[in-house]
Amino acid sequence: MNYVQQIRDKAKLILIDVIILSVIPILALLLRFEGVIPAAEFMVFRNSLPWMVMISLAIFYFYGMYHRIWHYARIRDLIAIIGAVTLSQAAIFIVTVMADIPVPKSVTILTWLLSICAIGASRLMFKVNLDMVTESKGNKTNLLIVGAGDAGAMLVRELEQNAAATTNIIGFVDDDEKKRHGRLAGFPIMGNINELPQIVKANKIDEIVIAIPSADGDTIRHIDSQCHQTGAKVRIMPGIYEMVTGEMAMGQMREIRLEDLLRRDPIHLDFAKITNYIAGKTVLITGAGGSIGSEISRQISRVGAKEIILLGRGENSIYEIHQELKRKFPEQTYHTVIANITDKERMARVFRKFQPQVVFHAAAHKHVPLMEIQPDEAIRNNVFGTQNVAELADKNHAEIFVLISTDKAVNPTSVMGATKRTAELVLQEINQHSNTKFVTVRFGNVLGSRGSVVPLFEKQIAAGGPVTVTHKDMTRFFMTIPEAVQLVLQAGSQAEGGEVFLFDMGKPVKIKDMAEDLIRLHGLTPGKDIKIIYTGLRPGEKLYEELLTSEEGTTSTKHKKIFKAHIQPLDEQDLKASLQTLNETTDRQTILKTLKHMIPTYKSKQLENAN
């Protein structure tokens, strides 16, 4: 129902009421005088009828009789009819008394009773007619919108323009009680979110669309849990970030994703500061084909870098991100480089050729169990690869170097975490003798990355289960990829040199709960349709992650979601000696003992078992 249809329906109701209000008084007179109306009485009514009808229509209008949703009429609507008719007849009676117009009281009472019956019957017929029209649209999808705000109104316009032939919009639900029983874009606001199951059942809803782009994860989770009870298909409008970046348009809809359930307040960035250190600069991104590296390249492209060098050793991933960026940002200059960060000569040629002013170092090995098996490769890539790129940045006078680290570097129990902590120490040492500002950013898991648990869970659910979780109490910090990269860029703008920045990761999330959420998002029931089994912790895995060691403290920064850790660098000579040992050996026990020497909080099961 659109605005034109709404006006038509109001006009129909007013016309019906005019006919009823004109006929009922004559019928009351016929009953009063047993079928023969005296000429004098008839003349009085004929002259009075126009203003009586006008008074009744005015009272009906202000009483809301033409704003009600008769398609969903209930007992309270019948009470409203009684109230409106009673008020109008009382007003007419007062006028006739004051104007000394002779109207028998019995006629007034009969008119009151007959008007209630006739107007009530007209509304019932109106409801039946609308129900028949709705049923005739059986090939259409009955759609309910959650969120009676600007986004909901925009969605209605989009659907009426592009999906009118297949979609029958029924109305809205919204938790704002002030909106209850009102209308938006011509459609009724039918109740609140907790009433979703009843509303869906009563109105045969096929699909529910969540139209609250600013809603946080807890709100989305609550709405989804209510929707899950209905059996209706559920979709969602994009979040604020997706619309701002152009990833999705306002009127588009998609399935609910896990990241929707983890939404936090939008991050407010100081774009002026980010622009100051990136705009017009040559930027090198290592690991540019990975989850974090590719998102850094997207966001930097919006800032307006002079040139962006996309470096990685996997040709397919570099090719894919390059094609995407060229399509989205045709004015931006890109260079693709296939190289291994541990290849000193190759990387030196890259730095000499492009002379990058800003470096984002996202290249790393990150799979914990794999690095437990081959610690020498983790050392070569995560430690010496980082050292190689950092020293070249210093030698070629880069302005800022940002290392992407991990919460697994804190009190590490894995080789991967220990090598990332070592890379942080290497960066701090280089920073002490360089004009380049070297900083580290530490954060937890990112949703949607190729190494996260989510893709694994998705495959297991698609295969019919079971979903494998290592431990029922395992928790992790999670951020979305765009959220993490926004904070990486902001942290870079605050760099003075030597800092380790931490992000506000929100509350840790139980992996078990995440698995259950994903199962429900597929319309299935955890434990019934898809089993969850617990496999035990893998080598190097923690039950929970930390962002700080017990010795470290933090201070706030100018951004409320970014903190600076107080970390003491390792003795320079000790660091160099340890790095030399790591560089000269491939022996597993020597590597683990050296890492333990450099990082006293490192706890290695392999070392403990060897002892």
Residue ranges and their predicted role:
Residues 200, 204-206, 305-306, 351-360, ...:
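Proline-aspartate-enriched helix->loop->beta-strand connector
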Residues 222-282:
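Flexible, Lys/Arg-rich cytosolic regulatory linkers and terminal tails that connect or flank
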Residues 33-37, 126-245, 319-320, 327, ...:
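A solvent-exposed beta-alpha-beta segment
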Residues 338-358:
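Conserved Rossmann-fold cofactor-binding substructure of NAD(P)-dependent oxidoreductases
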Residues 245-246, 361, 365-424, 431:
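Conserved Rossmann-fold NAD(P)-dependent oxidoreductase catalytic core, especially the SDR/UDP-sugar
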Residues 268, 273-277, 429-445, 450-611:
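Strand-loop microenvironment adjacent to phosphate/nucleotide-handling motifs in alpha/beta enzyme folds
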Residues 1-138, 143, 167, 229, ...:
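Signature of alpha-helical transmembrane segments in polytopic membrane proteins
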Residues 283-301:
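N-terminal Rossmann NAD(P)H-binding glycine-rich loop of SDR-like oxidoreductase domains
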